[in-house]
Design a protein with these regions (language model features):
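Short alpha-beta junction capping motif
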Residues: 565-604, 677-679
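Extracytoplasmic/lumenal acceptor-recognition loop(s) of multi-pass membrane glycoenzymes
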Residues: 180, 364, 372-376, 400-471, ...
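A glycine-centered loop/beta-turn motif at secondary-structure junctions
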Residues: 653-710
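Active-site-proximal, structured, solvent-exposed surfaces of multi-pass membrane proteins
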Residues: 531-532, 712-815
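Short acidic, glycine/proline-enriched helix-loop-strand junctions
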Residues: 480-512
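Membrane-embedded transmembrane-helix bundle of lipid-linked glycan/lipid transferases
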Residues: 1-381, 390-393, 472, 486, ...
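An acidic, glycine-rich "communication" segment
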Residues: 601-662
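Membrane-proximal, lumen/periplasm-facing interface regions of secretory-pathway glyco-
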Residues: 366-397, 411-413, 505-509, 533-536, ...
């Protein structure tokens, strides 16, 4: 007992030392996402003080966001609790969080060590676990606090999986289920990674031990039910249209050469933001595979397979698998290390000299990463650091003049810290951007703002800031290649839209527009774009309205006939003939319709991209287009940019009047022209995308001719005052004008007392008082899933308990028979 108390005391001391060193480090809270989690915890803490146990909506980020819906809520509650323990100080709460995670993670290993009769080794692993280089990376570089919380119970999960599979201990099944539920509610994506790692372990188990597969089936069922038990939250999280990235490109970033994962000096030469498996850990894994007893070998093999899967040579293989977008293999490193350490813990035949050497290597491997904890030790406080950031980026001044919402275009270079500074609980203002964009209903809107900044579509950028309700804007300028010309273009575009430059420094320009305190926007567009890639034309021609729905059957003739031009690219339909009839009717009555042939859907009946009597056929160009013979003259467009030299596009058959053609292999290929009448225009060769990439003036003139639009024209916008009040479960909006864009993002938890309409992911209301009530999304469906999962879980536990009891009786019977036989022999 005294030994246990001593170990617990040592763990507590280590945790306090960690808290102290971090508090004096001068760089805390570090980590790209840390401030995002601190912000959420602080918002929840304030809500809890006001009696709101589950904030449905936070208006401060992304024009309003459901912060508890798309990111697992357990870490948010945990951080709110830590903030309460710190007396309401969110940064003190962060230190408490680190201390608790360090302490509880260590305690998990100690409990496991005691259970296996190896309390000293378990205590050492517990003291080491938080300081493993990859775990420190997650906490202090990535700022992934939810994953850090998962690390607390991961060893217990591995222990119970091993116990159920190898020891056939029934009580381990409920425990591993509960561990998995906890991890799912901490970080659903990471729980999925743990489940995939478990599949590897199960495969190794099946090959090594050749036992009944029923135990594996039970564990996998427990994992599946663990996911489903969280259905009351998980169903709504998956149902609400959460935006995802180009997953294959993101996935590629989480593979690296094997030697990079094993280079212990890389952290000293390239910084600490590198994934490191650990040379010592790899030596342990290889040593275990070669010399460990069969009972403790499975974890070593699992760790080795995971390590191999982190290498770049495996990317081309894994990317072909279904669900590969979730295989961010470098994120699996801590899981692999946990399996390896657990196998070492239960390897009770290993000679002490070897064990001591391995432990020394593991400890030495952590030393370079410890700087992540103690930093510069200059004692700079978070408040001082944030104040310096706010002054250097002009955020402080921008907040002081913001009436409604502030837009900071930083391309995430400042991480979540800038988002916290803008909307901090003390003196924050509402922001167009935020942190954790995957939870934003306006994810597409802000993505286009970033893209327009990168592509120098400044007129579009400032105009859409107005649409999003931003009266103040901060734009970085230090990365401009041609400072004089670029800054002049930026200022001119801002002035055209109505912004005035208030201040500037070497890094940022600050713009502001005089507006009513709280305002909405009434807008008239000349044109409308429909389809997944229609926004490209909007960036080049800001007077083209973006839309949310790509389905032509969602629109009416009356709705589209109000526009001078309708642009279609990447559109869909449910009823092809109805869509074609509507488009043809529009053109016959004076509306110009321009269709990008590359974005025409494939006809399911013919397997060909066809629409309104035309069909499109694939063609590839290398490096650049051939000579383009058009009604505007012969064009010689710019070459394709680097990375786009293999240009996959289409040409068009069936045009009545060909306005543009190119010759390829002695064949004339139409890429531009009309069908049926001069208002129905088709464009091929993916010229819109080419223009977005190159800004080729020749192509721009062609597109302007086709669209009959001026690239410098803006939509007609009128700012109108609104009275907006946010409550715990409702938003009250008072407007004196009809069809007002409130600049509040649209969510499926909204129900209005009078009709509300979504346009481009933003809420539009009518004249009068609109009360939008909010309710927990998909409560009945989610609760039903959790209830069914709970019943099935109990059934699984009961069935496995009966199986265990039967096996126990059989074992007791065998033992009793042996004892009787021995007595008879005597």
């Amino acid at each position: 007992m005294l030994g246990c108390l001593l170990v617990i005391g040592i763990y507590a001391a280590i945790s306090f030392v960690v808290m102290y060193l971090v508090s004096r480090s001068g760089v805390y809270p570090s980590g790209s996402d840390t401030m995002c989690h601190i912000y959420k915890g602080s918002v929840l803490y304030q809500a809890l003080k006001n009696g709101n146990w589950y904030p449905l909506f936070d208006p401060m980020w992304y024009n309003g966001v459901e912060m508890m819906r798309y990111w697992a809520p357990m870490p948010v509650y945990f951080l709110a609790m830590c903030q309460a323990l710190a007396g309401g100080d969110c940064f003190g709460g962060y230190l408490v969080f680190l201390g608790i995670v360090s302490f509880l993670g260590a305690l998990s290993w100690f409990v496991i060590g005691r259970r296996h009769g190896r309390p000293v080794l378990g205590a050492i692993f517990g003291a080491l676990w938080f300081f493993m280089p990859n775990n420190l990376l997650a906490v202090f570089v990535e700022g992934n606090l939810p994953r850090a919380l998962c690390m607390v119970v991961l060893p217990l999960f591995v222990e119970n999986v091993h116990d159920y599979l190898l020891e056939q201990r029934w009580s381990s099944l409920p425990k591993l289920t509960l561990c998995f539920v906890f991890m799912t509610m901490c970080h659903t994506g990471y729980a999925g990674m743990i489940a995939l790692a478990l599949l590897i372990f199960a495969a190794v188990y099946a090959i090594l031990y050749r036992k009944s597969l029923w135990s594996i089936v039970h564990v996998l069922l427990a994992i599946i039910l663990g996911f489903l038990l969280t259905g009351i939250w998980l169903y709504a999280s998956l149902k609400g249209g959460i935006t995802s990235t180009d997953s294959s490109q993101v996935m590629r970033q989480f593979f690296q050469e094997a030697w990079l994962s094993l280079d212990p000096l890389r952290r000293l030469t390239q910084g600490f933001d590198v994934f490191y498996f650990g040379l010592a850990a790899f030596i342990l894994v290889i040593f275990g595979i070669l010399f460990a007893k069969k009972r403790s070998m499975a974890g070593f093999w699992t760790a080795f397979i995971i390590f191999i899967c982190t290498t770049t040579m495996m990317y081309d293989v894994l990317v072909l698998l279904p669900g590969s977008q979730y295989l961010w293999m470098l994120r699996f490193i801590s899981i692999a290390l946990c399996f390896a350490l657990y196998s070492l813990l239960i390897w009770n035949t290993l000679k002490k000299p070897f064990l001591v050497v391995i432990l020394l290597l593991l400890v030495l491997d952590t030393v370079p990463s410890l700087q992540l904890i103690y930093g510069t030790m200059d004692g700079t406080t978070p408040a001082q650091r944030l104040e310096q950031l706010e002054e250097g980026t002009l955020i402080a001044e921008a907040k002081s003049i913001t009436s409604q919402r502030l837009a900071l275009i930083d391309l995430s270079t400042l991480g979540a810290t800038a988002a916290y500074c803008i909307s901090d609980p003390e003196d924050g203002v509402m922001a167009t951007f935020g942190a954790g964009w995957q939870s934003a209903a306006t994810a597409m809107n802000i993505s286009r703002l970033n893209e327009s900044y990168e592509n120098m579509n400044y007129l579009y950028m400032f105009d859409r800031m107005v649409e999003l309700g931003s009266d103040t804007a901060l734009v970085p300028v230090s990365n401009f290649t041609n400072q004089t010309d670029d800054l002049l273009q930026l200022d001119e575009a801002a002035k055209r839209v109505g912004y005035e430059r208030i201040d500037s420094n070497e890094g940022y320009y600050l713009y502001h527009m005089d507006t009513p305190g709280s305002f909405g926007v009434c807008t008239t567009y000349d044109a409308i774009g429909i389809g997944t890639s229609a926004s490209l034309i909007s960036m080049a021609f800001p007077s083209v309205e973006e839309t949310s729905s790509t389905n032509l059957n969602d629109y009416t003739y009356e709705e589209l006939s109000r526009y001078h031009t309708v642009y279609l690219s990447g559109f869909t339909y449910d009823q092809k003939k109805e869509a074609e009839d509507m488009i043809l009717k529009l053109t016959e009555n004076g509306t110009r319709v321009v269709i990008l042939a590359d974005g025409i859907p494939v006809d399911t009946a013919t397997g060909i991209q066809s629409f309104l009597g035309t069909d499109s056929h694939n063609i590839n160009f290398k490096n650049g287009y051939p000579e383009l013979d058009t009604i505007d003259g012969v064009l010689h467009p710019d070459l394709f940019p680097s990375g786009y030299t293999d240009w996959k596009t289409v040409y068009i058959n069936g045009l009545d009047d060909v306005w543009g053609a190119a010759t390829d292999l002695d064949q004339s290929l139409g890429f531009y022209g009309t069908k049926y009448n001069e208002n129905l225009i088709f464009i091929g060769f993916n010229l819109t995308y080419h223009y977005a990439l190159t800004k080729d003036q020749q192509v721009g003139v062609l597109l302007a001719h086709a669209l009959d639009l001026d690239a410098n024209a803006l939509p007609e916008r009128t700012l109108v005052p609104l009275d907006v009040t946010y409550g715990a479960d409702r938003i009250t909006i008072v407007s004196d004008t009809d069809d007002v864009n409130t600049t509040i993002s649209d969510h499926d938890i909204f129900t209005g007392n009078q009709p509300i309409e979504e346009k481009n992911h933003l809420i539009h209301v009518s004249k009068g008082t609109t009360v939008i009530t909010m309710s927990y999304p998909y409560l009945k469906e989610g609760a039903l899933i959790s209830l069914i999962a709970a019943i099935l879980t109990v059934c699984l536990w009961a069935a496995t308990w009966k199986r265990a009891q039967k096996r126990k009786k059989e074992t007791e019977s065998i033992i009793k028979n042996r004892e009787n036989n021995n007595l008879n022999r005597r």
